[in-house]
Amino acid sequence: MDQNPNMIDYKKLVDGYLGLADWRVKENSTVTYSIGGLILSNSGAVTANYWLSHVYDKEIADAHRRADIHLHDLSMLTGYCAGWSLKQLIQEGLGGVPGKITSSPASHLSTLCNQMVNFIGIMQNEWAGAQAFSSFDTYLAPFVKADGLSYKEVKQCIQSFVYGLNTPSRWGTQAPFSNITLDWTVPEDLKDMPIIVGGKKIEGITYGDCQREMDMINKAFIEVMLEGDANGRGFQYPIPTYSITKNFDWSETENNKLLFEMTAKYGTPYFSNYINSDMEPSDVRSMCCRLRLDLRELRKKSGGYFGSGESTGSVGVVTINMPRIAYLAIDEQDFYTRLDKMMDIAARSLKIKRNFITQLLDEGLYPYTKRYLGNFDNHFSTIGLVGMNEACINAKWIDKDLTHEKAQKFTKDVLNHMRERLSDYQELYGDLYNLEATPAESTSYRFAKHDRERYMNIISANDYGDPYYTNSSHLPVDFTDDIFAALDVQDGLQTLYTSGTVFHAYLGERLSDWRQAAHLVRKIAENYSLPYYTLSPTYSVCKEDGYLEGECGLCPYCGGPTEVYSRITGYYRPVQNWNDGKAQEFKDRTEYKVDNDAIGYSQEEPVEAVESVLKLIVTKTCPKCKEAEKLLTEANIEYEKVYAEDNPEFVRKLGVKIAPTLIEKAYVEPDADDDYFYYTGINGVHRYVNYNKKGNGNDE
């Protein structure tokens, strides 16, 4: 008897996961190989089969199975991403769902931090993608003011928030995918509004009166993110987005030093460009309130690359395989005919999904979403694309990649055509549609893998190794090491998307200091119109010696294995967790070099070495540095403490790459060059202390 095609081979499914034989095991790099991952894999296969067999019609299901399009998040019977009103949580508390406990509005910062962690964790189980809060620092500041909290108390609260969000509490042994936007300075639309604490407005105190407390929140958050975990590993969540406005203060404030040191070292923040883009800082709070008077108007999704503005988001994402359309098209007219057909299928699938999950919402399947959101009216239906660079190469009438003007012009025409089509769908279906530069963590690999098997002569991003397509309309990953040459091209393309577009400045290793990072961030904001961008240095982590600059397969100090971290389609994960296609992309990348003259940055004169015999190189936020200081002090060993942040040239001159590092000046002949002994990491300091307790002198 023939097997029903909708039946799942459970043995193949489980064995494929356990033996890592199925590429989907690494489809999402945030999911750890674990029993939770196995459960998610099994349930995901069942749910995906349900979508394709019982919800979508045959035309939609076949288009996905053939890899003409990719229906994202088939493994979950939920919407895609959502932004939530932190103001609403502060006013109403956490709860209000029948049969579940309810917490009153928070009266203290510690309580609010706990409620935010629980809220995001709950919502992450009702959605497939990122959960976001806007104006994090603005809304939290009044709680600091109301209780007169010390900086130590504020930092403790923020620390519990960050650690709570990074606990793998979500299905699949994942941490909740979370994003926050930080205003840095009090937004104009909130300045004169009375603060809310304990669910009540407090007359006589406005958000504009809380800038000092905002600074405390921002300092605490950045210090926690800079410190990383006990092994020096950067925190994955929340992904912070900072607003760069025309009145951004670029002076050498304490918080600026911390912000751009975090950027230089870990590449953690996203930056929203409010200087030259057509966005406004208040968009994250006002999008849900706008009247839809013109059905053809395409709105931009606010709230950051992954995040969403208050009470907005996306019900689902469908990505179109652009290289295949170009490869099969006879000419340009045929290309647009094929593209329109795929867009029609994508738009219809999103309408079906919206109707289906709206029915489930009304039936109570997402109780907390129903309580805090109510409906999906302000959530987009999202259509994205992958491989426009390879589409241009495969198109017989272009036959060039995106580094050529002919291909760039064609790409702009295609994106504008897609925008017009989205306006048609808004009129037809009455829903919001947007055009996204899809992150495509697994989709770029899936499309290329299918196409290489099916079409012998189709061109992917690489001629060797595992195939992949370039994300959205990005340039070839090995195009140039000149960041501004890449920006010049991308600026004209990325501004045509209405969501999910970002420029990643991939850097081989951390920038030299916070000033260099600040100069580069400012140069981009003031000279380009693209809405979001990041600086993305590669770094490694050794469990013994902590943070290491750049890509280090083995620790240069202890010889042990490391985790190499880079940004995969928007967030940092160990490269060994990436799927084969993205891992190949990482190998192929040409990283950008930063020309200091181009960004108007000049390094300060080298700091001369002082004459003390023993120096301890530390950073201001590293817990292992404090441990090293304690070891030396308790052993009655005299030393001079040198902050790496304040003496970057001196530290670079001595070749120090890890904090803490203990440097001992060796005895040499009077006219000889200085020589030094290095004791690297906390283990090196331990060795020095233990050896010198015995009075034996140097051990290296």
Predicted feature residues:
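Intrinsic, low-complexity terminal and presequence regions
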Residues: 540-557, 563, 567-612
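Hydrophobic/aromatic-rich, well-ordered segments within soluble, folded domains that form packed cores
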Residues: 178, 182, 376-398, 555-579, ...
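Structural micro-motif
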Residues: 652-664
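Non-catalytic, surface beta->alpha helical segment in thiol-disulfide oxidoreductase systems
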Residues: 665-700
